[in-house]
């Protein structure tokens, strides 16, 4: 589960680079939304991984 958190985090970083860096000027809003969605999913996956590891 922690691997999913890392994958989602990397995808969120890539979306942020494209969205906030001006490379994809037409898709800035979409990149911002995807960044926060993937960030939340990554955090949830990280917490779930830590909870499952504790059992």
UniProtKB/Swiss-Prot annotation:
> Where in the cell is the protein located?
Cell membrane
Q: Which UniProt keywords apply?
A: Cell membrane, Membrane, Transmembrane, Transmembrane helix
InterPro entries on file: DUF1328
Note whether Oxidoreductase occurs among the keywords.
Answer: no
GO CC term, one of those recorded: plasma membrane
- Specify the protein's topology with respect to the membrane: Multi-pass membrane protein
List all membrane-crossing ranges. Answer: 5-25, 30-50
Family (UniProt): Belongs to the UPF0391 family.
> Mind telling me which NCBIfam families this protein's record contains?
PRK13682.1-1 (NF010226), PRK13682.1-4 (NF010229)
Q: Which HAMAP family match?
A: UPF0391 (MF_01361)
The protein's name = UPF0391 membrane protein H16_A0156
């Amino acid at each position: 589960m922690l691997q999913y958190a890392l994958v989602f985090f990397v995808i969120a970083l890539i979306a942020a680079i494209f969205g906030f860096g001006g490379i994809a000027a037409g898709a800035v809003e979409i990149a911002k939304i995807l960044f926060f969605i993937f960030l939340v999913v990554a955090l949830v996956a990280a917490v779930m991984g830590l909870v499952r590891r504790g059992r």
